[in-house]
From Swiss-Prot:
HAMAP family: ROTA_NSP1. Residues 82-176 are annotated as: Important for cytoskeleton localization. Belongs to the rotavirus NSP1 family. It is found in: Host cytoplasm, Host cytoskeleton. A motif (pLxIS motif) lies at residues 485-488. Residues 42-79 are annotated as: Zinc-binding domain. This is Non-structural protein 1.
Length: 491
């Protein structure tokens, strides 16, 4: 069993404060829980196991047992997980507060050791000092933490995580924060704790301490779309659905500027217990709009695109063609439920086809052309250099004419009404008959930016904001967007 989990189970019986702070779902009776998908460490009980999604941030960081308490490291309520979570710059005083908290709730002294030994020896055949029976006394104080970066803020969730070499399918990575403190002083504090243990347990304590205090920090892990669960969506079939978030709060709202001070609250047991009595939950409906999700969707489109359409004579939009084996696209993917992506695909293909028909002689969708290679890349607008190269390749294929050192192409083929509206919006209310390279690039960019302006999007969804930030955004009515009314970013 996990050392931290065992320590919480046994130490919660010491006093009333510990009974409140160290209550873990992993040590309670199992209740029905969401299906676990990913391997990693539960931030609540620190054991390596199958993880399920958190209802506070949609990340996979909680085990099936601990999920019953719905605790998130971004909560406002100062439960144990939140008090172990630090943010951004950590100074020596912050670390001192964490160490003091550990000493308060996980003390190792002669009285505590004798109490646990007497409890164990009451059981049959437990007179030996086996590690399995005294695992809870072998919890060293280390500065081992799991770290994650969210929108420029770096979070460190301290704890004692066993089996660091096991599989990790989460965006968290291990860091050693011992450099933020005095290494020799931390050694001394742990040796003081170790001296109260029986000799048979001291070696194991020392091994655990040094293995978790002398390791090399891991490389930061990149986040991807699959790090976030879809289970918080109000309607999973609706790509514009809001995410339902639950956060644990207290009546005395706390300032994020004092984020690293939470662990010091436990120093005043009376006030801490009064504060925890005021705990309640807040619920928010939050838009899932962000660069991470948008890039994932546009990447899928770039792989599904049927470039043959740009040479076709079909009278239908690109997504509506059904009877042509070269142009028919598989529109059964869930991604096409999003009207924004349908508009982007149809408009982009309509515009490119108009350019091709206006400037070349090729007129059938069964043709095999070199320009096909660059069509999929025109949807990956966030890769600026690659996108510019693709637009340039397409433009050069149209055999532009140079006038006064500026190259132009024609645009005299029929456009859809919607695409004409996009061009008029960009070109001062007109649909010009000739376009320069900059004009073509501006129009193709606008087709995507009108709905997904990735240049100004936040990297991750708003759901990973702190509780105070969610509260402020909700007050200003900025947690939702206007896409349900088919309003674009520009509108």
């Amino acid at each position: 069993m996990a050392t931290f989990k065992d320590a919480c189970y046994h130490y919660k019986k010491l006093n009333k404060l510990n009974g409140l702070v160290l209550k873990l779902g992993a040590n309670d009776a199992w209740r029905p829980a969401p299906v676990a998908k990913y391997k990693g460490w539960c931030l609540d009980c620190c054991q390596h196991t199958d993880l399920t999604y958190c209802r506070g941030c949609a990340l996979f960081h909680v085990c099936q047992w601990c999920s019953r308490y719905n605790r998130c490291f971004l909560d406002e309520e100062p439960h144990l997980l939140r008090m172990r979570t630090f943010r951004n710059e950590i100074n020596k005083e912050d670390v001192e507060g964490l160490i003091n908290m550990y000493n308060i709730i996980f003390p190792i002294n002669e009285r505590v050791v004798d109490k646990f030994i007497n409890n164990v020896k009451q059981r049959k055949c437990r007179n030996e000092l086996l590690i399995e029976w005294y695992n809870h006394l072998l919890l060293p104080i280390t500065l081992q933490a799991l770290s994650i970066e969210l929108e420029g803020d770096v979070y460190y969730i301290f704890g004692y995580y066993d089996c660091m070499g096991k599989e990790n399918q989460t965006p968290f990575h291990f860091v050693n924060m011992i450099n933020r403190y005095d290494r020799l002083l931390l050694d001394d504090k742990n040796f003081d704790r170790m001296m109260h243990l029986p000799v048979a347990l001291q070696q194991e304590y020392a091994l655990r301490y040094f293995s978790k205090s002398r390791f090399i920090s891991q490389i930061k892990r990149e986040m991807n779309r699959h790090d976030f669960s879809d289970n918080l969506m109000e309607e999973r079939d609706n790509p514009m659905s809001f995410m339902q978030v639950t956060r644990n709060c207290v009546s005395a709202h706390m300032n994020d500027n004092d984020w690293n001070e939470r662990c010091k609250l436990i120093g005043d047991a009376r006030n801490y217990m009064e504060l925890m009595k005021s705990a309640y939950t807040e619920h928010y409906s939050i838009s899932n709009r962000c660069k991470l999700f948008t890039i994932y969707k546009l990447n899928i489109i770039s792989k599904l695109v049927k470039p043959n359409y740009i040479f076709s004579n079909h009278g239908l939009c690109a997504l509506d063609v059904n009877n042509c084996k070269w142009c028919k696209i598989d529109n059964h993917y869930e991604i096409w439920n999003d009207f924004r992506l349908r508009k982007i695909y149809n408009n982009m293909m309509n515009f490119i086809r108009a350019l091709v028909k206006s400037n070349t002689n090729v007129g059938h969708c069964s043709s095999h052309e070199l320009v096909y290679k660059c069509i999929s890349s025109v949807f990956i607008v966030w890769k600026i250099e690659k996108w510019n190269d693709s637009v340039r390749t397409l433009f050069e294929y149209l055999e532009p004419v140079e006038i006064n050192h500026v190259e132009y192409v024609l645009l005299d083929h029929e456009l859809s009404w919607e695409m004409s509206g996009v061009i008029m919006q960009i070109m001062n209310g007109k649909v010009p008959r000739i376009l320069s390279f900059d004009d073509v690039k501006k129009i193709m960019g606008a087709i995507i930016y009108d709905w997904f302006d990735v240049r100004y999007m936040r990297e991750t969804p708003v759901i990973v904001s702190t509780t105070n930030e969610l509260r402020k955004l909700n007050k200003d009515n900025n947690l939702m967007d206007g896409y349900d009314y088919e309003l674009s970013d520009i509108e």
